Design a protein with these regions (language model features):
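A short, proline-enriched helix->beta-strand linker immediately N-terminal to the Walker B motif
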Residues: 166-170
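P-loop NTP-binding/switch modules centered on Walker-like glycine-rich loops
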Residues: 180-256
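Conserved ABC transporter NBD signature motif
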Residues: 60-71
Length: 322
């Protein structure tokens, strides 16, 4: 086990307080790729930042995140700084938010090799240029000497991905690596992640097709809750949670827009109950209570449809056993 996240919650201590992540658990094995998917605001990016100690000071983080046996959440900043970059590589969300405007992009992509692998500057930049050309980043002739201001947003984002890959860390944590990219560039990112044979990946994305392409397992989040977690093929072919089913049905190739096909409930059960209930076609009185996480054949789902005796019957109809 490389990363073991146990019951991580994040609350922001301001105003009335905002619960951004609630009791999320997942694991990432060595060389495994896990994607966290969900709508904007579901808490998936905040979970990633919590693991890396990159949230603001008003964030209250509880739970555990063991990386090779060491709890990242309890770890001192100075100790974590030694791990980040060398063993954990982070690709932030946004078009090059992590790039220094005063340094060439070629040097910045090469810097993790220079800093953590102690590779000579000339050799590291040569490797960076090779990788950048592969991702079609920058001018072919000037790729080593260009500055961020000469790059488009998509180029900056691909440069950040190249920086994360070149470090050779045990694990890459990527936040929306395909955001703002066209289909051709997304294919380049897919190819890049497929090339990572010895590195694990924990990736946040709203793009289910991208998750399908690269994932071994997928965790689905909705309104700060983890609602489903299963092997990727199993989850995409046989989704159990109503939200996951609706999200997959809303994929463009399935012909349904996300606003269609939902039976709206008459009450908002956000306080203490299932947060998807107001949009769920299976909503019932029991949904006013918080559903437990049920596990069936390695497939986890947080829904009253799969809880208790009634849940066992419903699960068996879907070919599942507790």
């Amino acid at each position: 086990m490389l990363l073991d996240v146990k019951n991580v919650s994040v609350r922001f201590a301001s105003g009335h307080g905002v619960q951004a992540v609630e009791n999320v658990s997942l694991t990432v094995d060595k060389k495994e790729k896990v994607c966290i998917v969900g709508e904007t605001g579901s808490g998936k990016s905040i979970l990633l930042l919590a693991i890396l100690h990159l949230l603001p000071e008003n964030a209250i983080v509880t739970g555990e995140a063991f990386f090779e046996g060491e709890d990242l959440i309890r770890m001192k900043r100075r100790q974590l700084d030694k791990i980040r970059g060398a063993r954990l590589s982070y690709v932030p969300q946004g078009s090059g938010n992590g790039l220094n405007p005063l340094l060439t992009v070629g040097f910045q992509v090469a810097e993790p090799m220079i800093e953590h692998q102690k590779v000579k500057k000339k050799e590291a930049i040569a490797e960076a240029v090779r990788l950048m050309k592969r991702f079609h980043i920058g001018d072919e002739e000037k790729v080593a000497s260009q500055y961020p201001f000469t790059y488009s947003g998509g180029m900056k984002q691909r440069a950040m991905i190249a920086m994360g890959i070149i470090a050779g860390a045990d694990m890459i944590l990527a936040d929306e690596p395909t955001k703002g990219l066209d289909e051709e560039r997304i294919e380049m990112v897919v190819e890049a992640f497929h090339s990572l044979k010895d590195q694990a990946v924990l990736c946040v994305t709203h793009d289910l097709n991208f998750a399908r392409e690269i994932s071994d397992r997928i965790s689905v989040m909705y309104a700060s809750n983890q609602v489903e977690y299963a092997p990727a093929e199993e989850l995409l072919e046989h989704p159990l949670h109503p939200y996951t089913q609706d999200m997959i049905a809303a994929m463009p190739e399935n012909g349904l827009h996300f606003s269609e096909g939902f039976a709206m409930a008459h009450e908002n059960y956000a306080d203490g109950g299932c947060k998807y209930a107001p949009r769920c076609r299976f909503c019932k009185e029991k949904c006013k209570e918080t559903p437990p996480m049920a596990e069936m054949d390695g497939h986890k789902v947080r829904c009253w449809l799969y809880a208790g005796k009634e849940g066992e019957a419903h699960a068996s109809e879907n070919g599942k056993t507790f």
